[in-house]
């Protein structure tokens, strides 16, 4: 019913991980092309915060395999709310679109990710992103006015 392909998506240093995907995006990749690839993608699945933010800003379905946050003395990831991605997704009421990585592993299956992508509340996310953009614009106007 849904035809989706996984494509390895680079960070500024390129793709430094092994993957079984038939496609990958190479570097150098201009910033606007990077942004556009996320904006117009069917979905983004990954570990980095900035692509999650771009996805949310544009209403692109996303799922985070999250390694951010604090770890204890033994290297165990603490799912204690310290992850910046967890915070952002919580603000957008998308906690189910995230799983934590602990010691390089997470209990995740493809069905869970695909269901999250298919049920992604695009209109709700776009509306909230627009609200934050407007709030940010007002804040910047106030800062500039205070400097004059």
Predicted regions and their residues:
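Active-site anion-handling motifs in enzyme catalytic cores
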Residues: 1-148
């Amino acid at each position: 019913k849904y035809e989706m392909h996984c494509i390895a998506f680079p960070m500024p240093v390129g793709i430094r991980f092994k993957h079984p995907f038939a496609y990958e995006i190479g570097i150098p990749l201009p910033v606007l092309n990077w942004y556009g690839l996320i904006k117009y993608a069917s979905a983004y699945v990954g570990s980095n915060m900035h692509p999650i933010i771009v996805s949310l800003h544009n209403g692109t379905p996303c799922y985070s395999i999250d390694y951010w946050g604090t770890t204890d003395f033994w290297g165990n990831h603490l799912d204690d709310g310290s992850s910046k991605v967890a915070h952002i997704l919580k603000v957008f009421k998308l906690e189910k679109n995230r799983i934590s990585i602990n010691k390089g592993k997470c209990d995740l299956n493809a069905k869970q990710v695909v269901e999250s992508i298919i049920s992604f509340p695009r209109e709700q996310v776009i509306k909230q992103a627009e609200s934050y953009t407007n709030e940010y614009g007002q804040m910047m106007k106030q800062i500039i006015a205070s400097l004059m």
